[in-house]
């Protein structure tokens, strides 16, 4: 089984350093099509069974209403499952760009068994769960701040301990080359 996980940064193109981010910052308001096409070409070449997509635009003004998960699913022949990354009671869902920010998983099953859960802390709380290829695949995007990220990790460890089927936890863990990452 081949799995790919990619933070696509809303299809804005990945800046190479903070100076480049300043020059390309306008892409966060109107994403060019080229980076998303390049991501699709990459996935076509790799041919993964499961694709986890973080920072996916689900149809905001930035993409002229285009759902990036649907576009990449069309390019790969996989089925998209996507959810908004903020909890249903989040005030961010009332804002045009934020209400269309999500995460997605692309799988071969035509009617995948999927669910959205939410961590109890942080801004990005989504825990996207999909059963595919004989496993339960969890996709998360952890907090930027260390204390909140640690709370999320503890919550995930406790919550996923009860999962009795084979599983994979994947995502953007925002570790920034930390040397004190603990494995258990």
Task: Label each region the model flagged.
Residues 6, 54, 140, 170-172:
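Active-site flanking residues adjacent to catalytic metal/cofactor-binding acidic residues
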Residues 1-75, 82-90:
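N-terminal, active-site-proximal structural segment of metallo-dependent hydrolase catalytic domains
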Residues 45-47, 134, 161:
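Alpha-helix termination/capping residues and helix-transition junctions
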Residues 11-17, 138-140, 148, 159, ...:
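Membrane-proximal envelope and lipid/glycan-remodeling enzymes
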Residues 50, 135-136, 166-168:
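Structural motif
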Residues 22-29, 56-58, 115-118, 138-147:
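Surface-exposed cleft-lining segments at the edges of enzyme active sites
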Residues 146-184:
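Metal-dependent phosphoesterases centered on the DNase I-like endonuclease/exonuclease/phosphatase
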Residues 55-134:
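Structured beta-strand-rich core segments of catalytic domains in phosphoester-bond hydrolases
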């Amino acid at each position: 089984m081949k799995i790919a996980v990619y933070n696509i940064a809303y299809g804005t193109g990945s800046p190479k350093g903070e100076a480049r981010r300043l020059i390309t910052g306008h892409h966060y308001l109107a994403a060019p099509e080229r980076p998303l096409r390049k991501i699709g070409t990459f996935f076509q070449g790799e041919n993964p069974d499961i694709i986890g997509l973080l920072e996916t635009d689900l149809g905001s003004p930035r993409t002229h209403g285009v759902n990036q998960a649907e576009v990449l699913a069309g390019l790969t022949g996989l089925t998209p499952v996507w959810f908004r990354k903020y909890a249903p009671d989040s005030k961010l869902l009332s804002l045009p760009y934020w209400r269309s920010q999500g995460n997605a998983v692309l799988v071969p099953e035509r009617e995948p068994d999927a669910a959205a859960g939410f961590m109890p802390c942080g801004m990005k709380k989504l825990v996207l769960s999909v059963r595919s290829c004989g496993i339960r695949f969890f996709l998360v995007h952890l907090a930027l701040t260390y204390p909140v990220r640690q709370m999320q990790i503890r919550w995930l460890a406790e919550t996923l301990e009860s999962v009795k089927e084979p599983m994979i936890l994947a995502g953007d863990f925002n570790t920034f080359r930390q040397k004190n990452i603990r494995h258990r």
